[in-house]
Amino acid sequence: SMNEVAQIMNTEFIHPDGQRLVVSLALMDSGDQTDEVYDFCLLNSDWVLPSKGTSTMLSNYRLSTINKAGSNANGMTLVLVDGGKYKDMIAARMRKPNGRGSWMVYKDCDLDYAEQVTAEHKVTERVNGKVVQKWVPKTTHADNHYLDCEVYAAAAADMQGVRSLYLQSQEPEKPKKPEPAPTPEENWIRQNESWV
């Protein structure tokens, strides 16, 4: 239920160093139960935005405005997400060996999650005389909810600038201060080191 979603998403995660973390942004698919999702997003606008998948964009995501006269959501931000681009990224990371930039999961990963996150594959089709590639379910009626969750999580992470966070943790090299010019006394000592 939506109440359970709100409860989980507002739960604090306590990092081993004691830092308390909460979800700062989540995207919720508004393609189904649109009005219910819009109402939920209005009530929880501090951390969730409605989103909708699309495949006709030049960018990974785009902010739009809901234009629904008579709705409480009229004027609210809607995030349009190119699911195909994010699925391409996820698939590419799954093919990488474990390590930085790869797709890794917890060793006791739930089988249902694993099956859903890999429930689609990319196929080549001819549409209106043009050859296009698109993501489709591997089998009829295959659940792909967790894959969609990962797509929206990746879009939310991009909106928050997560990919560049590692740059903030790297301290810039401090420029070395030029050594001051030696004083006349220091020069005399260097030139006459054997005077002692």
State where each predicted segment sits.
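Mg2+-dependent endonuclease catalytic cores in nucleic-acid-processing enzymes, primarily RNase H-like
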Residues: 1-130, 172-196
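Charge-dense, low-complexity polyampholytic segments
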Residues: 162-175
